[in-house]
Curated annotation (Swiss-Prot):
[4Fe-4S] cluster binds at residues 169, 172. Homodimer. This is Fe/S biogenesis protein NfuA. One of its GO terms (molecular function) is 4 iron, 4 sulfur cluster binding. Involved in iron-sulfur cluster biogenesis. Binds a 4Fe-4S cluster, can transfer this cluster to apoproteins, and thereby intervenes in the maturation of Fe/S proteins. Could also act as a scaffold/chaperone for damaged Fe/S proteins. Belongs to the NfuA family. The gene is nfuA. Its cofactor is [4Fe-4S] cluster.
Length: 212
């Protein structure tokens, strides 16, 4: 596989997206049915960096190629990656799993929902980034999630992040341990000015929670 990019704005962000051999074979068969010389696939993310992020793939005929797309050449077809989507496709894998019903194309993109933050990002944006990138993937193992409600400048305790736990974390008997040893520690490691982390969630409402 070779790569090519004419967009200097993202020249340092080379995508490492992988299309496995089995997926390449499957896509090659689909593309061959289009009877269009030089046709490839275009890969992009809708609503990147949000909980609604969705990874997409579409046919891309030669005349439809977007000049700023990053081109990956596979043996039987080209793949064009939407330049703004590149950071959200980090470590993404497109695979094809055969089964008795035929098979299924799968798209795993662990960073598609992770928001990006720049050097001038607000503390709210930085906290949300850490929650999405570092904390929620671990909580997801219990069917839980965590989101930022607000940041308060508490006169007594200093800068305080108020969090809301949901899903499997709601009603969890070990929430204090989870908050203190996990979430709070991780947030303070990444955001040095943060002094305290508190939980806004009412854990008495245990219905539908993972832990009871």
């Amino acid at each position: 596989m070779s790569t090519e990019n004419t967009n200097t704005a993202v020249a340092e962000e080379i995508p490492n997206l992988l299309i496995t051999p089995s997926a390449q074979e499957y896509l090659h068969e689909l593309l061959a049915k289009q009877n269009t010389p030089g046709i490839g696939v275009r890969i992009f993310v809708e609503h990147p960096g949000t909980p609604r992020a969705e990874c997409c793939m579409a046919y891309s005929a030669p005349e439809e190629v977007v000049p700023t797309d990053y081109k990956q050449d596979y043996p039987d077809f080209p793949a064009y990656i939407d330049a703004p989507s590149i950071p959200y496709l980090l470590d993404a894998v497109i695979d094809y799993n055969k089964d008795r019903f035929g098979g299924q194309l799968t798209f795993r993109a662990p960073n598609s929902k992770v928001p990006r933050v720049g050097p001038d990002a607000s503390i709210e944006e930085r906290i949300t980034y850490v929650l999405q990138a570092e904390i929620n993937p671990g909580l997801a193992g219990h069917g839980g999630n965590c989101s930022l409600v607000e940041v308060q400048d508490d006169p007594e305790h200093g800068l305080t992040a108020v969090l809301k736990f949901g899903g499997g974390c709601q009603g969890c008997s070990a929430i204090d341990v989870t908050l203190k040893q996990g979430v709070e520690t991780t947030l303070k490691e990444h955001i040095l000015e943060l002094q305290r982390v508190v939980d806004q969630t009412d854990h008495t409402q245990a219905e539908g929670a993972y832990f009871k």
